[in-house]
Regions:
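Active-site activation/catalytic loop segments of kinase-like enzymes and analogous catalytic loops
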Residues: 84-115
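Activation of the activation-loop gatekeeper triad in protein kinase-fold domains
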Residues: 17, 77-82
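Conserved ATP-binding subdomain of kinase catalytic cores across diverse folds
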Residues: 1-23
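Regulatory N- and C-terminal appendages and interdomain linkers associated
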Residues: 74, 104-156
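AlphaC helix of the protein kinase catalytic domain
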Residues: 22-33
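Catalytic-loop of the protein kinase fold
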Residues: 53-63, 68
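Conserved protein kinase catalytic/activation segment
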Residues: 65-77
Length: 156
């Protein structure tokens, strides 16, 4: 996570990742070697585990919200952060974060079962895996959210 320097109202000034010539690219624009992919995947999962251990879920994690610079990663964009005990859809949101991370890293050659990994991390922190999606937490315009809702309706 970039180091925060100042805060005013709903804005936080944070550390710049990059150099004078360019900002760090998002991981979504980077093709990793197999040797690079696994350690970076492990680093992302470590960060997810640390967040969860501090009662936080990123809420919108994907390769678009991870910066890549000089062989390292930095998670960014935290306005959707969720408390796992306070949000009825916390498990589904966490599962979505882990699944998106796994989708990117699978394309980079890393073997990953997003659902299994998310459940392991989730339950290791004392949370229960739930099957229900709280419809108030879904975006009707988002095809991924509609798919989640449809899948849940079929399962009933």
């Amino acid at each position: 996570v970039p180091k925060p320097y100042a805060m005013l109202k709903n804005s936080i000034m944070m550390e710049y990742i990059g150099d004078a010539g360019s900002a760090a690219p998002t991981l979504s624009t980077v093709r990793l070697t197999r040797d690079e992919a696994r350690p970076l995947f492990d680093r992302v999962i470590l960060n997810l585990n640390l967040l969860l251990g501090n009662q936080r879920i990123h809420g919108d994690l994907s390769a678009y919200n991870i910066l890549y610079w000089e062989g390292d990663i930095t998670l960014i964009d935290f306005p959707q952060v969720v408390h796992p005990e306070a949000n009825p859809s916390a498990w589904i949101i966490f599962l979505r974060d882990v699944t998106r991370v796994c989708q990117y890293f699978k394309a980079q050659g890393v073997k990953c079962d997003g659902r299994k990994l998310a459940a392991e991390l989730w339950t290791a922190h004392g949370h229960k895996v739930v099957k229900e999606v709280d419809p108030s937490q879904l975006d009707a315009e988002d095809p991924k959210d509609r798919k989640l809702w449809e899948k849940q309706k079929v399962g009933k």
